[in-house]
Amino acid sequence: MKKLLILNGSLSEATLIEEAKKLGYYTITSGNNPSLLGHALADEYIPADYSDKEAILKIVKENNIDCIVSCANDFGVITSCYVAEKMGWPGHDTYENALIMHQKDLFKDFIQKLGLRTPVSKVFESYDEAAKYVKTVEYPIIVKANDLTGGKGILRADNEEEALFAIKNAINRSRTSRFVIEPFIVGNQQSIVTFVKDKKVIASVTCDCFSPINPYLIQSELLFTDTDKAVENELHESIEKICNTLDLKDGIFTLQYIVSDGKPYIIEMMRRCLGNQFLTVAHAVTGFPWEEALVKAEIGEDLSNLKWEKPLAKYAGHHGIMVRRNGKIKGYTIPEELQKHIFKKIDILKPYEEIDDYMNQRVAYIYYKYDDKQEALDTIKRMNDIIKVEFAD
């Protein structure tokens, strides 16, 4: 039996682990948190920091592993591309391309040169240089650590004082101490998730993003959006242009963007599975086998026999149950008006476990489906009020 290494075992990778086993692979997970739920689904767990590309390469060689699948983190993508390149494996972009796409400064520079619409960024490595720059800018701006995901190391600034604080935050959070400063674009934040085969988009889904508790961390999403067809076509053309320019491999390609004055401004991109089992929701509204396609693409298997299914719902989404303070959680209740729409639920915290970072931690995830989009939107906007979380302290 061939051995496959997946670079983490969190909730986000659980469906990939299950898919790899369905495909007949002896599935090994890594990562440095042994308590993650996905490790129990795998055949074996080998602890390692998946951002340490040399450590992962050593594991691959010592354990006669045959192929590698990235995780829901940019560092994991960079590592998987590096290891695949060293081992001569198919299914992954070059290490150089992985860096271009998952380091904010390199990516923004690349797409600006390519002529794609994006907020114009300026890259910094020193506090003093950036401090001088923010005396001259038009506010608001946004400051982003160069190499982090999930909203970490990102702050909006509406004046010089806030900008200096945001710069210090980005420097302290980034592993490289590099960060970007760019104009804050006012508009609707959305994502487009596609699967690319032979540099052409063959499956696509758009979603609205909601971040009511932490403005830099998506808490809820709803698929599909009412995206203007011209906007969607422009995004598809941008994705295919990037794929052709960099000679990218088959796989997931996601763009996060802001629609302002009817035009999309690209702000982030990802070549990996998304967090919170997003692909489960994407399958619900498209019928496309996202997890199967991703795993097969990254291990170099044939994609010609992928089968589309009838979509589960017209609209679907996910919501991470969060709270507005730290403390010990006793439990939570979901009202019937929402419960009847839920098709999947995953508890993250057990009763009496502690929340110590309420701006980022989730109590549970719920996955819901609707036939009426306005009903879904109205409910999503009230979820933090109608889902009752009880504290034990």
Where are these regions (language model features)?
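Short, well-ordered beta-strand elements within core beta-sheets of diverse protein domains
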Residues: P183, T227, H283, V363-D371
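Active-site "cap" helix and flanking loop/linker of ATP-utilizing ligase/carboxylase catalytic domains
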Residues: E234-L255, S260-D261, M270-N326
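ATP-binding N-terminal substructure of ATP-dependent carboxylate-amine bond-forming enzymes
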Residues: M1-E96, D128, V323, P351-Q361, ...
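Glycine-rich phosphate-binding loop signature in dinucleotide/nucleotide-binding domains
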Residues: I59-I65, K135-V137, S174
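Peripheral (often C-terminal) accessory segments that flank ATP-dependent C-N-forming ligase machineries
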Residues: V295-D393
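A conserved helix-loop-beta module that forms one wall/lid of the active-site cleft
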Residues: E85-G153
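Protein kinase-like catalytic core scaffold
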Residues: I202, Y265-E268
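Internal nucleotide-binding/catalytic subdomain
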Residues: R156-D261
